Amino acid sequence: MGIEQNNPMALPLWIAVGLAATYLGAVVLTAELLNRLSLSPAEVTRKIVHIGAGQVVLIAWWLSIPGWVGAIAGVFAAGIAVLSYRLPILPSLESVGRHSYGTLFYALSIGLLVGGFFSLGLPIFAAIGILVMAWGDGLAALVGQRWGRHRYQVFGFRKSWEGTLTMVLASFLVTVVFLSYTFGFTVIVLVVAGTVAIASAGLESFSRWGIDNLTVPLGSALIAWAGSYLWLG
């Protein structure tokens, strides 16, 4: 079931890592500039980082960056997140109106998924988990805040059905795209993607401490892997 990680550009590792780091730096810098210049609401700048940072998995996949590099990078990013909680060095990473360790969990989830699935030769499942979190959760938050009219509560956290539906749709589309790329577009792919989407929305509904930034990517990646192994492999 593995996918060959061929580097089409045959770049040395240090250049590949440098390109990925440059991309992440550009994402954070853009968000910081928007935040410091007050050109966009604080929550929007956070979601720019949230969505933008997740795309690094595609760069790592395309450039065949080894899993161990991703694991180390995840630990390094987690360290920066912890430091940013102590010192206001990157306000664009801070949660708005709530105490959260979401950035820390997000960095750890990327490190775990890239380190694990890339090392197994299964980068597609790392991509699914990370991009479900990036696009699903990121868009759900923005849609819920802007257009959320129908509210409900889960363990004291207010959610909107509009945001939850966005999470389901984005997660479904991400999973369908990547599974279809690998296994072809089939009914089973739709079933697996639907399972991932519903489970991801359920995991996202419990977001105390920002733990959904860990449970959503790990859960969606593992469900996609298990479903593919059982029904598509």
UniProtKB/Swiss-Prot annotation:
One of its GO terms (cellular component) is plasma membrane. InterPro entries: Dgk1-like (IPR037997). One of its GO terms (molecular function) is phytol kinase activity. It is a multi-pass membrane protein. GO terms for biological process: phytol metabolic process; vitamin E biosynthetic process. Its EC number is 2.7.1.182. Pathway: Cofactor biosynthesis; tocopherol biosynthesis. It comes from the Bacteria. It is an enzyme of class 2 (transferase). Keywords: Cell membrane, Kinase, Membrane, Nucleotide-binding, Transferase, Transmembrane, Transmembrane helix. It is found in: Cell membrane. The chain crosses the membrane at residues 9-29, 56-76, 96-118, 122-144, 172-192, 213-233. It catalyses: phytol + CTP = phytyl phosphate + CDP + H(+). Disruption phenotype: Cells lacking this gene show a reduction in tocopherol levels by 50% or more, and an accumulation of free phytol. When measuring the kinetics of chlorophyll labeling after adding 13C, the mutant cells show a similar rate of chlorophyll synthesis and degradation as the wild type, but show a reduced rate of accumulation of chlorophyll containing labeled porphyrin/unlabeled phytyl (13Por12Phy). Catalyzes the CTP-dependent phosphorylation of phytol to phytylmonophosphate (PMP). Can also use UTP as an alternative phosphate donor, but not ATP or GTP. Is involved in tocopherol biosynthesis, via the utilization of phytol generated by chlorophyll degradation. Also plays a significant but not critical role in the recycling of phytol for the biosynthesis of new chlorophyll molecules. Belongs to the polyprenol kinase family. PANTHER family: CTP-DEPENDENT DIACYLGLYCEROL KINASE 1. This is Phytol kinase.
